[in-house]
């Protein structure tokens, strides 16, 4: 049971915020895995094209997420200051900003889809490129819908209600799976069917959560969407937090693409092993990632209330819980490695690599990952976004990308090189964020402008 000496959030409040977040991330990941398996039944070209486009889509989604994060922090601080009117005004500007940005990104990707894919993935087979172009066109149409849904879900979390986004997300994911079953296996529409199913599920999620936001009696109530007009002072506050976060997230996704291109140089058995390791390692991170998302709301509310010491207290508490979850999920996933490798049909060589690397990850990760990724959310919630951006982007490119290239291309470390670089990246972040957190400069920062 969560115990806290803070006054803004009881243990029950924290459980109500965090448990649905954990459930949502796990469910979404499971549905994403099922989605990939279903598309794979269409053929290698289809699953390869979808995989390539998803790598680009993730970069775009990070841009929308960054704007939503900026809005979450601003709204959470308004709510902490007991200014519900300010929080509702800011929420309207978050929706407007994300809608415009996501619509422009979607239009650009639709018009330039061939140029974008040719630039990022130059040497793919024509069948893969054709599948990717089809998938990119349809999924780009969904950008405004997934952007608005993400912003609306973030606003619910800022208000301390993560249960509704969880339920809407679950419904959308189930619709996507059902749509895949119909479009892929009944109508046999191939990649077009997979993209259409994804887009329709995102439209539904967006429509449902906007309808829910209109209900009176909630902390944040949104209605008359077409009457929303820009409030540049609020938009500036949101983007002051959102832009550095967007740069940080964008650099992270680009760095992942660079690492993927380096891994592609390895033998087939190691590439297959690395794909499985990535999936399993992600599952060990999800509960702690949910803790980090919740901490943005918790620390933001504390800072808005003028109680930085409570923000510090909750950050330490939730980092400890993040540590515990990393240990528990790591052990559980490691115990499942052999059965998963057997069921997935991995070769013996690939399976041996997966078992060895997951043991190493299970041992190393608890020492560095929680400190690398949990306290940084409190820094962002306090407005210390530039420091977070510089540390994260610098560590990603210097250690995860450059060190990975050196270890694999020049020293022949194989998959082990990927994870050595990853561990060094995590350790570097942990050191910088711990120092920043302990020194306390973030506790004296402000997101809300004085005249608000």
Where are these regions (language model features)?
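Short alpha-helical transmembrane segments in multi-pass integral membrane proteins
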Residues: 1-21, 75-142, 186-243, 299-365, ...
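N-terminal transmembrane alpha-helices
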Residues: 5-37, 41-42, 58-70, 74, ...
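Transmembrane helical elements of multi-pass membrane transporters/channels
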Residues: 16-35, 138, 172, 201-205, ...
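Hydrophobic alpha-helical segments of membrane proteins
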Residues: 26, 30, 103, 107, ...
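Helix-terminus/linker motif at the lipid-water interface of multi-pass membrane proteins
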Residues: 26-48, 117-126, 182-191, 250-283, ...
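Small-residue hotspots at the loop-to-helix junctions and early N-terminal turns
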Residues: 44-55, 132, 136, 195, ...
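Small-residue-rich hydrophobic transmembrane alpha-helices
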Residues: 47-107, 149-165, 271-337, 369-392
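Short runs within selected transmembrane alpha-helices of multi-pass transporters and secretion channels
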Residues: 68, 138-157, 165-173, 194-209, ...
């Amino acid at each position: 049971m969560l115990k806290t000496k803070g006054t803004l959030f009881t243990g029950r409040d924290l459980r109500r915020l965090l448990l649905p977040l954990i459930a949502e991330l796990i469910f979404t990941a499971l549905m994403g895995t099922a989605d990939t398996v279903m598309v794979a039944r269409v053929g290698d070209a289809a699953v390869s094209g979808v995989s390539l486009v998803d790598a680009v889509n993730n970069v775009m989604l990070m841009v929308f997420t960054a704007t939503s994060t900026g809005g979450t922090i601003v709204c959470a601080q308004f709510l902490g200051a007991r200014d519900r009117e300010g929080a509702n005004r800011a929420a309207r500007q978050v929706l407007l900003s994300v809608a415009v940005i996501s619509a422009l990104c979607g239009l650009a990707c639709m018009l330039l889809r061939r140029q974008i894919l040719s630039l990022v993935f130059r040497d793919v087979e024509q069948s893969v490129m054709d599948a990717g172009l089809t998938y990119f066109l349809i999924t780009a149409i969904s950008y405004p819908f997934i952007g608005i849904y993400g912003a609306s879900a973030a606003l619910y979390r800022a208000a301390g209600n993560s249960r509704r986004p969880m339920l809407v997300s679950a419904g959308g994911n189930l619709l996507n799976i059902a749509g895949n079953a119909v479009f892929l296996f009944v109508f046999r529409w191939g990649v077009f069917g997979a993209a259409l199913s994804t887009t329709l599920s995102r439209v539904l999620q967006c429509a449902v959560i906007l309808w829910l936001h209109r209900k009176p009696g909630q902390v944040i109530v949104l209605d008359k969407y077409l009457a929303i007009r820009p409030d540049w002072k609020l938009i500036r506050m949101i983007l002051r937090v959102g832009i550095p976060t967007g740069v940080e997230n964008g650099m992270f996704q680009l760095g992942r693409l660079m690492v993927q291109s380096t891994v592609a140089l390895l033998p087939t058995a190691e590439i297959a092993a690395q794909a499985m390791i990535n999936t399993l390692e992600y599952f060990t991170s999800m509960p702690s990632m949910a803790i980090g998302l919740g901490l943005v709301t918790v620390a933001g509310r504390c800072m808005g209330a003028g109680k930085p010491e409570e923000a510090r207290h909750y950050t330490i508490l939730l980092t400890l819980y993040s540590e515990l979850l990393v240990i528990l999920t790591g052990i559980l996933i490691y115990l499942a490695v052999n059965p998963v490798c057997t069921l997935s049909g991995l070769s013996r060589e690939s399976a041996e690599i997966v078992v060895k690397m997951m043991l190493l990850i299970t041992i190393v990760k608890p020492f560095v990952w929680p400190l690398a990724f949990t306290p940084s959310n409190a820094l962002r919630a306090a407005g210390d976004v530039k420091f977070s951006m510089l540390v994260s982007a610098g560590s990603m490119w210097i250690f995860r990308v450059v060190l990975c290239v050196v270890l694999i291309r020049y020293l022949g470390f194989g998959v082990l090189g990927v994870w050595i670089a990853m561990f060094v990246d995590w350790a570097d972040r942990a050191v910088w964020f711990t120092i920043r957190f302990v020194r306390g400069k973030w506790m004296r920062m402000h997101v809300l402008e004085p005249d608000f």
